[in-house]
């Protein structure tokens, strides 16, 4: 009888101990829209690019599997805002975007600069100094509150294009004077889309006009939206605290820079 009682007490203790342990969050699967923004994002890049890999790794640490669905630039964010996909990433917050999207902690920051032709520089101390400059703008992108204020005031003249490479071609042809883009992305696109004799005609300004935070966004009406944001933030912190974040950035950047396709004759 004593043996039975001891066995029952032991079994009860095991059950109570198991119940007291925190349960692992159930595994979730989500789809995020992606686009071509190398070396941070890109379908043919190793790991889909630096930012794509960081997003996947951070979610994985919180039991979330991520699949990517690629869209043209001007449809990437819209697909998240209307719920076609669960979310997207690589976006800075604006009041308009916050109406439809939940924002995580920033993953990386983009150093936004103006690219120009080497033979036509545009120095400035304030964006209002660029009065009447023709500035290429990619449809769907946000270039800071100050940039928008200068456009509204008529100090900057926006010239729209569907993607960044088209804007760089327009800059090379003299159809625009300046093109704002992340320093690393601009240099990557120029090196991989233009012959050296053309690439050397374009240069970035040294001064950045904005350091843009790049967030993951989740459709605001998603029934697990707040949970997904919390899981991502937790996974991102774990990635950063472990030192894996910096290792992944360095490894993926090196792999992305080593990757290239032949440039078509121009």
Short names for language-model regions:
Residues 24-95, 99, 251-255:
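Extracytoplasmic small-molecule ligand-binding "clamshell" domains
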Residues 68-129, 140-143, 203-208:
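Acidic, polar ligand-binding/catalytic clefts
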Residues 78, 91-99, 178-200, 207-210:
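A ligand-binding cleft/hinge motif common to bilobed small-molecule-binding domains
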Residues 55-64, 105, 129-131, 140-162, ...:
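Ligand-binding cleft/hinge of the Venus flytrap
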Residues 39, 45-57, 118-153, 167-169, ...:
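Bilobed "Venus flytrap"/periplasmic-binding protein-like clamshell domains
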Residues 113-123, 211-226:
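A bilobed periplasmic-binding-protein/Venus flytrap-type ligand-binding module shared by bacterial periplasmic
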Residues 74-86, 102, 129, 165-192:
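Short helices/loops that flank or line small-molecule/ion binding pockets
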Residues 52-61, 215-248:
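Extended ligand-binding regions for polar small-molecule ligands
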């Amino acid at each position: 009888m004593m043996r039975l009682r001891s066995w029952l007490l032991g079994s009860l203790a095991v059950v109570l101990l198991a119940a007291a342990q925190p349960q692992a969050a159930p595994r979730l699967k989500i789809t995020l829209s992606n686009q071509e923004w190398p070396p941070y994002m890109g379908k043919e890049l190793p790991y889909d690019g630096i930012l794509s890999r960081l997003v996947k790794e951070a979610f994985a640490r919180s039991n979330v599997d991520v699949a990517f669905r690629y869209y043209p630039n001007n449809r990437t964010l819209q697909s998240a805002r209307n719920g076609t996909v669960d979310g997207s990433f690589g976006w800075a917050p604006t009041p308009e975007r916050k109406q439809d999207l939940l924002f995580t902690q920033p993953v990386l920051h983009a150093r936004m600069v103006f690219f120009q032709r080497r033979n036509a520089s545009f120095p400035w101390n304030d964006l209002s100094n660029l009065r009447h400059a023709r500035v290429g703008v990619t449809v769907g992108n946000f270039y800071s509150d100050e940039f928008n204020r200068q456009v509204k005031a008529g100090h900057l003249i926006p010239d729209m294009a569907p993607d960044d490479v088209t804007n760089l071609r327009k800059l090379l042809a003299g159809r625009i004077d300046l093109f704002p883009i992340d320093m690393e992305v601009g240099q990557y696109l120029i090196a991989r889309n233009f012959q050296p004799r053309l690439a050397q005609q374009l240069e970035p300004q040294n001064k950045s006009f904005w350091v843009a935070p790049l967030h993951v966004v989740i459709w605001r009406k998603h029934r697990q939206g707040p949970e997904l944001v919390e899981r991502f933030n937790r996974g991102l912190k774990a990635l950063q605290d472990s030192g894996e974040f910096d290792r992944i950035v360095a490894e993926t950047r090196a792999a992305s820079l080593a990757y290239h396709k032949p440039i078509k004759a121009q």
